[in-house]
Amino acid sequence: MPLLILLMLLAAGAAGAESATPSLHIGVNYGANADNLPSPTSVATFLATKTTIDRVKLFDANPTFISAFAGTPISLAVSLPNSALPALADKATGLDAARSWIRANLSPYVPATNVTLLLAGNEILLSTDTNLILSLLPAMRRLAQALKAEGLTGVRVTTPHYLGILAPSDGIPSNASFRAGYNTKLFPAMLQFHRDTGSPFMVNPYPYFSYRPETLNYALFRPNSGIYDPATKLNYTSMLDAQMDAIYTAMKKLGYGDVDIAVGEAGWPTQAEPGQIGVGVQEARDFNEGMIRVCSSGKGTPLMPNRTFETYLFSLFDENQKPGPIAERHFGLFNPDFTPVYDLGLLRDGASVAPTPSPNPSPNPSPKPAPSGGGKWCVAKDGANGTDLQNNINYACGFVDCKPIQSGGACFSPNSLQAHASYVMNAYYQANGHTDLACDFKGTGIVTSSDPSYGGCKYVS
């Protein structure tokens, strides 16, 4: 361990011993789709010595980021891209492929870096690619076998799910169930995998993407009349509580109420489109304070009282190069100089709020967006084959943020392959230098000078 980090950790520990304020276990998502962030090493030192954040979730397996946390007490969750899963699921070669990936991406850094979770893709079930969906659980099994074979028994395997895995319902938790098909063909076996391996079932609940002006207080943990569940005789005054208990109910109906639930990401932006109601610093603080209270304080939810949940706030920093609506770039908890965007009580007692950041910019784990596309956009060609468009979505979402096309997102409606593919193809095109090649997508994309934005759905350019 570098001497400077060791001394800072010892000093931080001494300061913490004098504090009467208990530290809550909380994690954070660390994305770096920005050009103004401090180096991963300075980020790791800051989190380990100045904050109560004790775990970090990465969206890839960038070695610079993984090695930056060596010698710190921070637990790390590392992600594989969606595109890697089919090869890992292969019955004949999947285990060898999984072991090769682990040898290349984890073994050189563990145990110096405390990697505790390996995430098999992200929100795979958002896809309609049957092959990708069928690859998910076999790939998770191969990864678990490979980790054991490589001696990395402290690393657990899971995958983050979006809330669309639940069947449409009236929002009352006791009525929740998994979607038809998934509730019989996928989740019983997946939940058994989690039970057998001791890994959590990870979900990404996002009240931000589900609220309406009339439900804002319900989403932000503010006083409201709530929603009454007649089956359990419980009154819900928090949307997050209801979402978590809906997941729990669906799991319990399959006989797996004992499996741990983890929150892969959830947060609230501080800026959004002009005129959007319910977005700002106070709203972000209210939501994140409420989520920490529910997930990390031991309060739990109405159906899961006194429980804690492994939770990762979204996100560590604003990301000024993320495509999509304004809000996508403004979920950050800290500024690039490490000062808080707002106070969540995450700084250790006595910690300076303005340590000097590294002058070196963070390496970008995602393709770096080029300057403005100069009024050009990439969209799906009229008449493009639906299978091709879905493949385009699956591919592009491995590189760009696809939350806007998820249920509740600014670009979800119209819910069509043509619209969703156009949005993510354009995001990929802009992030890769807006060259004609970046819009080709095997002949299904076309460059246009007509802005395809509509309503609240803004196409980056």
From Swiss-Prot:
Keywords: Disulfide bond, Glycosidase, Hydrolase, Plant defense, Signal. One of its GO terms (biological process) is defense response. GO terms for molecular function: glucan endo-1,3-beta-D-glucosidase activity. Contains two additional disulfide bonds. Residues 350-375 are annotated as: Disordered. Disulfide bonds join C378-C439. Belongs to the glycosyl hydrolase 17 family. PANTHER family: GLUCAN ENDO-1,3-BETA-GLUCOSIDASE BG1-RELATED-RELATED. This is Glucan endo-1,3-beta-glucosidase. It comes from Triticum aestivum (Wheat). The gene is GLC1.
